[in-house]
Amino acid sequence: MQFFNFLLFYPVFMSIYWIVGSIYFYFTREIRYSLNKKPDINVDELEGITFLLACYNESDTIEDTLSNVLALKYEKKEIIIINDGSSDNTAELIYKIKENNDFIFVDLQENRGKANALNQGIKQASYDYVMCLDADTIVDQDAPYYMIENFKHDPKLGAVTGNPRIRNKSSILGKIQTIEYASLIGCIKRSQTLAGAVNTISGVFTLFKKSAVVDVGYWDTDMITEDIAVSWKLHLRGYRIKYEPLAMCWMLVPETLGGLWKQRVRWAQGGHEVLLRDFFSTMKTKRFPLYILMFEQIISILWVYIVLLYLGYLFITANFLDYTFMTYSFSIFLLSSFTMTFINVIQFTVALFIDSRYEKKNMAGLIFVSWYPTVYWIINAAVVLVAFPKALKRKKGGYATWSSPDRGNTQR
């Protein structure tokens, strides 16, 4: 029974941890700031920001994103676009926009991955702070002000990651991911910030201190997820990462099952690659928040394989004609379902209440309250089974290239 308790209550424990962390973060750090007023900053003392946009086959989105960044009213900005050997007409579109606008364009002829593209861009950055954006990102006007303000109070802050919102919500998958980001990912980021270490910045929207990125050796070109990899390099060098929910951007998410599956496998593989690379280095740090993050990843992987082994054992040894066995199994199933549903209701309600400050209409997502987090754990389990073997086979020293992403539709 104790073994079963671990299988059942590990997801429950993590959900409770995220709920408590989110509530505490909201009332101590978030609610006191107004969304309608940007931080009071003296323009003469304002730090400059270099905006880095790395793109590969982004002809459908690059014009909107580049136009948005050009229109930002942030007083001290520099824009660098890096085309990573696109095979479509992305480069031609950027050259056309450049005819009437002032920005730096780095046109790489060979696709060598996002990390390599960012490395090429940051080496040309003039300012001490670098904002990395994906090529489908639309940034709110006040977001850079909220993010840069954090660096004034913490000299060891290496990066501030923002609050990505979803633009394409017309499809069922788009709506579900909107609720996922609001209720699950937002909870996790808030809780991890309180604990002292955020597992990963958001690759779509993060402001870095340039000297910190240089100090850790830039982005890794051979890691499948450059954002997770650089996050842990920053942690291991003693830098902090902070989540800033007031700094919002708008992005596109996959709207096909194939695109979503490919994205989630890539995310999981990237996390596992970092786990395999940085485990022993993390153990030497004597930093408890990093221990929590590392063991959370390890236990999540072990949980998946143990669940599968346990279910396989039950199936092989089951006596389906035994009334006592069937009654016991059914009661366990009911207990599991009730416990997970009860915790899910609490987590969704709390998370969507907090998130309603940014998008009130997301409260309609309570329709998913009873089942989605359970599905989330099942999907993650399937993803781990595919991603972990891929991480074990990672080739060091090469280039982790990217393919054309599933951006869905562009409506907001």
From Swiss-Prot:
UniProt subcellular location: Cell membrane
Membrane topology qualifier: Multi-pass membrane protein
Magnesium in keyword set: no
GO annotation terms (biological process): cell adhesion involved in biofilm formation
Keywords annotated in UniProt: Cell membrane, Glycosyltransferase, Membrane, Transferase, Transmembrane, Transmembrane helix
Similarity remark: Belongs to the glycosyltransferase 2 family.
Protein name in the entry: Poly-beta-1,6-N-acetyl-D-glucosamine synthase
